[in-house]
UniProtKB/Swiss-Prot annotation:
Keyword Ribonucleoprotein on entry: yes
Assembly description: Part of the 50S ribosomal subunit; part of the 5S rRNA/L5/L18/L25 subcomplex. Contacts the 5S rRNA and the P site tRNA. Forms a bridge to the 30S subunit in the 70S ribosome.
Pfam families noted in UniProt: Ribosomal_L5, Ribosomal_L5_C
NCBIfam families in the cross-refs: PRK00010.1
Protein name per its UniProtKB record: Large ribosomal subunit protein uL5
InterPro entries, alphabetized: Ribosomal_uL5, Ribosomal_uL5_bac-type, Ribosomal_uL5_C, Ribosomal_uL5_CS, Ribosomal_uL5_dom_sf, Ribosomal_uL5_N
Annotated S-S bridges: none
Keywords: Ribonucleoprotein, Ribosomal protein, RNA-binding, rRNA-binding, tRNA-binding
Functional note: This is one of the proteins that bind and probably mediate the attachment of the 5S RNA into the large ribosomal subunit, where it forms part of the central protuberance. In the 70S ribosome it contacts protein S13 of the 30S subunit (bridge B1b), connecting the 2 subunits; this bridge is implicated in subunit movement. Contacts the P site tRNA; the 5S rRNA and some of its associated proteins might help stabilize positioning of ribosome-bound tRNAs.
Listed GO biological process terms: translation
Amino acid sequence: MLDDATYTPRLKTLYKDTIRGALKEEFGYKNEMQIPKLDKIVLNIGCGRAAVKDSKKAKSAQEDLTKIAGQKALTTVAKNSIAGFRVREGMPMGAKVTLRGERMYEFLDRLITIAMPRIRDFRGVSGTSFDGRGNYALGLKEHIVFPEIDFDKIDEAWGMDIVIATTANTDAEAKALLKAFNMPFNS
């Protein structure tokens, strides 16, 4: 059994031992601090119309996101009222969580090795979903691809946004970093 004090996530070890050197060689960085690294991963579930009809749906989404992330999720609320959608200011609309450090590496490992292969008709993620500043965004149609979610106990399958923020300056650097972590790009 591993001691919690000595445990290091697999992808963090891979980054320190292999990826840093490969990126430094590929892009010709002169300083160690120039080498891109993962900064944070933000997970978001928006309930939309379901939350308007039943406020318990946002609570359910928050609980599911907490299970997936291994960290308590925040409930997101409507910033302003929109009468046409029957939305009131302060109404719970979904959940979000920001992962950093070891939990971030653990989540990325589970996403790439366990969750993505469980997606129906999966052919890789888009290689063009970068924002121009080295951050990558992807969406999942169903959050039930994560093994933490018991399919029989959920009332609704939610879509999910995942944003991977890196310290890379360009999209090419960020893509090389994520490819080194075995992110399955289709292009």
